[in-house]
């Protein structure tokens, strides 16, 4: 599990266009993990990042969303809600596991693995500045 102050390990994931994106980026980076594209909470969260995108850009901060959804599902989600930032597909859950967001969850008495909604702010030096876990929307 990654912690504040640690250097972000480099990794590549495909975005909603199928292009490989390498992180960490050279700018400040905000990475948010969301459970599933086009569901109420994830849509609200993603649209909130989109509506604040100009503010992030002003501070030279690049926004990335990561979920287990396929590239195709990410593409439909981005298109439907006019999201102008990269949505990355981690179908293997490897990156989610590295970040410590692939966790045991339970609903209606059933236990399963899923993404814990979390956000990571990474500095230009590649170090994690702040982590918000168990984000509520």
Label each PLM-derived region with a short phrase.
Residues 1-137:
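Chalcogenol-based redox active-site neighborhoods
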């Amino acid at each position: 599990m990654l912690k504040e102050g640690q250097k972000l390990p480099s990794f590549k994931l495909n975005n909603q266009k199928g292009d490989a994106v390498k992180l960490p980026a050279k700018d400040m980076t905000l990475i948010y993990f969301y459970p599933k594209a086009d569901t109420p909470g994830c849509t609200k969260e993603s649209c909130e990042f989109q509506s604040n995108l100009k503010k992030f850009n002003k501070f030279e901060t690049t926004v990335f969303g990561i979920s287990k959804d396929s590239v195709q599902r990410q593409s439909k989600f981005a298109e439907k809600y006019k999201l102008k930032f990269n949505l990355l597909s981690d179908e293997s859950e490897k990156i989610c596991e590295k970040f410590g967001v692939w966790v045991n969850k339970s609903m209606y008495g059933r236990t399963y693995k899923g993404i814990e909604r979390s956000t990571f702010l990474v500095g230009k030096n590649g170090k994690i500045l702040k982590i918000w876990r168990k984000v509520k929307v």
